[in-house]
From Swiss-Prot:
It comes from the Bacteria. This is HTH-type transcriptional regulator DgcR. Belongs to the LysR transcriptional regulatory family. Residues 18-37 bind DNA. Induction: Expression is up-regulated in the presence of D-glutamate. Transcriptional regulator that positively regulates the expression of the D-Glu gene cluster (DGC). The cluster includes dgcN and dgcA, which are involved in a deamination-independent D-glutamate degradation pathway, dgcR itself, dgcT, dgcP and dgcH. Acts by binding the consensus sequence upstream of dgcR, dgcT, dgcP and dgcH. PANTHER family: TRANSCRIPTIONAL ACTIVATOR PROTEIN LYSR.
Length: 291
């Protein structure tokens, strides 16, 4: 049996008539009848008997159907795969990003890109640095955008921006709001400690160690977001990435850079053996502009 024979046989068997099969296949009834006749001629036996206006499968057809159905399901799978490949011509962006970019930078980039290319599909999830490699290897994402990533085997890092750690503090803490601060100026303030904060935490503690700074802390949290929200409630001072700080500004809090600055890279990671699509390249440019 040819593939067309299988398609027509399956349609007639499951719908019960040539009329319904033609509708399901979006072809004419004579076309279905012709293909059925050709299939029966090649097989050397009848597949259906006409009984009171309906086509009833013969015993041979019923024996054949289970195998035909397996092939038909495979054909459907191939068709769906082909549709997905066709859809990728418009573009699919499977993206994992560090949560801080979700405040403004990522929504800004997606909105601008979607306006220009409305047929590109986005699938976005948040990720932490220690999850990036596994997410890429398991193809949960094509691209992971994180802060200051460590070198990973088989992974290429593309620097798309540079940012910095900043202090977030209540405005009442200083008579005039400084544009820059030193760690010495924060001594004595209640410090919100952010545990397990990855490479940015290492960057911060390295500087504090170099300057022999110890900040008093009675509150320890796991995320920059919670730390920033605590400051917004008037509790202490925290040091977070600039994106989290800007995303949580309010009338009563301010931010300041450090002197000297605590810079870090924003990098996009992808597997070395996988070439980025043109849509991903274009989106990275948009994201870089929004950052």
């Amino acid at each position: 049996m040819r593939l067309r024979h299988i398609e027509v046989f399956h349609a007639i068997y499951t719908t019960g008539s040539i009329t319904n099969a033609a509708k399901a296949l979006h072809v004419s009834q004579p076309s279905v009848s012709k293909v059925l006749s050709h299939a029966e001629m090649q097989l050397g036996f009848k597949l259906f008997e006409r009984v009171k206006g309906r086509l009833i499968p013969t015993e041979e057809a019923s024996m054949l159907f289970n195998e035909v159905d397996k092939i038909y399901q495979q054909m459907r799978s191939i068709k769906n795969t082909a549709e997905n490949i066709k859809k990728a011509e418009f573009g699919n962006i499977n993206l994992s990003v560090t949560p801080a970019l979700g405040f403004d930078a990522l929504p800004c980039a997606i909105a601008k890109y979607h306006h220009a290319y409305p047929k590109v599909n986005f699938n976005v999830q948040t990720i932490h640095n220690n999850e990036a490699l596994q997410a890429l290897l398991e193809h949960k994402c094509d691209l992971a955008v994180v802060f200051s990533p460590s070198a990973m085997p088989g992974v290429k890092a593309i620097k798309i921006a540079q940012s910095e750690l900043v202090a977030v503090f209540p405005k009442r803490l200083f008579p005039s709001i400084p544009a820059q601060l030193t760690f010495q100026e924060l001594e004595g303030a209640e410090f919100i400690d952010i545990s397990d904060s990855g490479p940015l935490g290492h960057l911060l503690w390295k500087r504090m160690l170099e300057e022999n700074i110890v900040l008093d802390s009675t509150i320890k949290v796991q995320t920059y977001f919670i730390a920033a929200r605590l400051v917004a409630q008037g509790v202490g001072v925290c040091i977070v990435d600039k994106y989290t700080a800007m995303g949580n500004l309010s009338d009563d809090i301010a931010i300041a850079s450090f002197s000297p600055p605590l810079f870090f890279n924003v990098s996009a990671l992808h597997l070395e053996n996988k070439v980025l699509s043109h849509v991903l390249d274009a989106f990275l440019n948009e994201l870089s502009n929004c950052i």
